[in-house]
């Protein structure tokens, strides 16, 4: 067969081995080590350069980030190892329909800065649960949301990225899985703890460049190996495992592999689900997810946030060419491994009887690239893994510190919040390591589809609550709460059913209940959104309307309302802490001052004890950004959160023009591959 003949010769190893013994050579290791040193240098530089001794300095990078690091961080936070492995794997298994997720995300990352971000800015929020607390009042919605976000981060984002990175790292280096993961997590946590969001954004900017260079090089090698896009279209439909049973349809390429819009009933991604069901989780991710929104809140002003979103949107065009198409090429070059159809053979190839499409990208790297470039692509995968993990670590730490810990300890000092945020990162690392065996046992044949199905069960209710809060002034706390709870309960029921009734292999009879077998997860997303929307509207309409202060400057239609001095309102969570002139944390809008732990320590320890403090202790305090500065060096006042929506007219015009160009490019790609 032509596709098999074009495969590079395997080294002396088991022909069924997914990753031959051809491993990284000395040149590859040198590139990888230099990359690590460079990234750590950038992280340490940003650690020294930026303000880290305030809540905003650590969690929002001081609110002074320019458009290009914001855009690079948005892209790098989204495109992790799960994208490289998952998108390429889905491309190999089912064609380019999975590209719809990337093109769909392009629209919503722009919607974030043009529509949602102005509301968040005028509302002066740091986290998404904080927005809901201000918009609806009470604590039950923000607490439910905070716990849900942490659940999603730990058990889908972190675990998926670690599993995807492990596929590449373990097989290319032939080292113990846990040793590789623990080492990566240690480096990742180090500059996340030390530098806060500034270190994350600066390293994301560097790693975005590394990812794009390496992925573009591999794309060139991939298309050259199959004769370009025309050659891929011809050879992809011939890419079948040589040991496939002749009477079975298992392992055959899909006839609609080069189309995005597919049959609404029998296909793997029905077109109504792509247009509507996919949009709800996409809106949650790009417009209300803490990981993404936190990057735009760190921008210098609204124009820089829009510029960052535009940069990320332009980059979202690339995954089709640097991930999906290379995954399809990998199937053409290595059909016996990537396109294996027999469960026993797949088990020998990749230890997964459901299929081995997820090895498509690592297989391409290890077999196609020469020495040196393999090391560069290894660095790209490590960059993707660390970028995604640092973003999640920092954002999850922000939610835990500002929305849960601050609720439990309303009088927590600035210093305590800093320490708690860093310690929580360490706990995330521990939980992530313990979750690795579960991830290994639960992954199916297509990692990316697993991610999206889980998202479709948990994210739509949250997205609907945010939409109603931002665009319907009549929505109140009772409606949002009952809509959120009902939606999450239905989503959890479907999630549990999916785990109980596992999707059968191609050669097995599907005996699952109709609600699982016949209702596609994208259609379920539409149903879940509708139920939540109806519940929010009905309950809100028949209960009391929200107060004026819960609407003013917190919806799209009231974002330009004048700032009103609020009366003292009892709240379980105090307003954000800032630093007063004498260095003590001061609650915004009140005269209450809380003593810092540093001042309490100074009452019990003499100046001599301070000067004789262990160098190790000083180093730890500096790492946490809470080092003792002495009375003559009181911490400076934290920069105020941006509240102005004013933009330079010329800059605004250029941004709007680029918005039109970017959307036009996306519409063209939708139409070309539809």
Curated annotation (Swiss-Prot):
Residues exposed to the Extracellular side: 1-25, 78-102, 162-180, 230-272, 330-374, 440-446, 501-521
Catalytic activity field: myo-inositol(out) + 2 Na(+)(out) = myo-inositol(in) + 2 Na(+)(in); 1D-chiro-inositol(out) + 2 Na(+)(out) = 1D-chiro-inositol(in) + 2 Na(+)(in); D-glucose(out) + 2 Na(+)(out) = D-glucose(in) + 2 Na(+)(in); D-xylose(out) + 2 Na(+)(out) = D-xylose(in) + 2 Na(+)(in)
Domain of life assignment: Eukaryota
Side of membrane Cytoplasmic, spans: 47-56, 124-140, 202-208, 294-308, 398-418, 468-479, 543-653
PROSITE patterns assigned: NA_SOLUT_SYMP_3
Regions crossing the membrane: 26-46, 57-77, 103-123, 141-161, 181-201, 209-229, 273-293, 309-329, 375-397, 419-439, 447-467, 480-500, 522-542, 654-674
InterPro entries: Na/Glc_symporter_sf (IPR038377), Na/solute_symporter (IPR001734)
Gene Ontology molecular function terms on file: D-glucose:sodium symporter activity; myo-inositol transmembrane transporter activity
Mode of membrane association: Multi-pass membrane protein
Family: Belongs to the sodium:solute symporter (SSF) (TC 2.A.21) family.
The name this protein goes by in its record: Sodium/myo-inositol cotransporter 2
Species assigned in the record: Bos taurus (Bovine)
């Amino acid at each position: 067969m032509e596709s098999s003949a074009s495969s590079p010769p395997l080294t002396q190893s088991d022909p069924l081995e997914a990753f031959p013994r051809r491993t990284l050579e000395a040149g590859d290791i040198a590139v990888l080590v230099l990359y690590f040193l460079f990234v750590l240098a950038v992280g340490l530089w940003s650690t020294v350069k930026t303000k880290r001794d305030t809540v905003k300095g650590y969690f929002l990078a001081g609110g002074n980030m320019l458009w290009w690091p914001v855009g690079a961080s948005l892209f790098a936070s989204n495109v992790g190892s799960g994208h490289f492995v998952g998108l390429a794997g889905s491309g190999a298994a089912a064609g380019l329909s999975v590209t719809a997720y990337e093109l769909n995300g392009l629209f919503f990352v722009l919607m974030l800065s043009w529509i949602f971000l102005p509301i968040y800015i005028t509302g002066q929020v740091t986290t998404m649960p904080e927005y809901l607390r201000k918009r609806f009042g009470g604590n039950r919605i923000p607490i439910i949301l905070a716990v849900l976000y942490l659940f999603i981060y730990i058990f889908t984002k972190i675990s998926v990225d670690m599993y995807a990175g492990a596929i590449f790292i373990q097989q290319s280096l032939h080292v113990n899985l846990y040793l590789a993961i623990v080492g990566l997590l240690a480096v990742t946590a180090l500059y996340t703890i030390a530098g806060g969001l500034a270190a994350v954004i600066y390293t994301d900017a560097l790693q975005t460049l590394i990812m794009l260079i390496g992925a573009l090089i591999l794309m060139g090698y991939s298309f050259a190996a199959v004769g370009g896009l025309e050659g891929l279209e011809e050879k992809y439909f011939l890419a079948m495992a040589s040991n496939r049973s002749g009477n079975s349809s298992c392992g055959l390429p899909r006839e609609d592999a080069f189309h995005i819009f597919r049959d609404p009933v029998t296909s793997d991604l029905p077109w109504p689900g792509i247009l509507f069901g996919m949009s709800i989780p996409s809106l949650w991710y790009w417009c209300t997810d803490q990981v993404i929104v936190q990057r735009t809140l760190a921008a210098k002003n609204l124009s820089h946030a829009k510029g960052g979103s535009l940069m990320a949107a332009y980059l979202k065009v690339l995954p089709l060419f640097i991930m999906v198409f290379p995954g399809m090429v990998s199937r053409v070059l290595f059909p016996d491994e990537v396109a294996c159809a027999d469960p026993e053979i797949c088990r020998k190839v990749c230890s997964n009887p459901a299929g081995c499409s997820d090895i498509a990208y690592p297989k391409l790297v290890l077999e196609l690239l020469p020495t040196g470039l393999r090391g560069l692509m290894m660095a790209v995968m490590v960059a993707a893994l660390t970028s995604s993990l640092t973003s999640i670590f920092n954002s999850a730490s922000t939610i835990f510190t500002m929305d849960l810990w601050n609720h439990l300890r309303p009088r927590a000092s600035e210093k305590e919040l800093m320490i708690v945020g860093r310690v929580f990162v360490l706990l995330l690392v521990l939980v992530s390591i313990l979750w690795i065996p579960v991830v290994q046992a639960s992954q199916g044949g297509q990692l990316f589809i697993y991610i999206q199905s889980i998202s479709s069960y948990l994210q739509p209710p949250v997205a609907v609550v945010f939409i109603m809060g931002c665009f319907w002034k009549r929505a109140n706390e009772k409606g949002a709460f009952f809509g959120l709870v009902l939606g999450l309960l239905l989503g959890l029921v479907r999630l549990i059913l999916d785990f109980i009734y596992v999707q059968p292999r191609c050669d097995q009879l599907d005996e699952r209940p109709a609600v699982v077998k016949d209702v596609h997860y994208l259609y379920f997303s539409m149903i879940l959104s509708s139920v939540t929307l109806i519940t929010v509207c009905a309950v809100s309409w028949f209960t009391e309307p929200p107060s004026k202060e819960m609407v003013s400057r917190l919806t799209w239609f009231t974002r330009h309302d004048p700032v009103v001095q609020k009366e003292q309102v009892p709240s379980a969570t105090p307003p954000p802490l800032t630093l007063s002139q004498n260095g003590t944390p001061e609650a915004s809008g009140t005269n209450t001052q809380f003593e810092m732990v540093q001042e309490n320590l100074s009452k019990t320890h003499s100046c001599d004890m301070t000067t004789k403090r262990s160098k190790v202790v000083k180093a730890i305090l500096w790492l946490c950004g809470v080092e003792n500065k002495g009375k003559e060096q009181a911490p400076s006042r934290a920069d105020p959160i941006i509240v102005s929506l004013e933009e330079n007219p010329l800059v605004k015009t250029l941004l709007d023009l680029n918005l039109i160009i970017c959307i036009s490019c996306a519409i063209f790609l939708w139409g070309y591959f539809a």
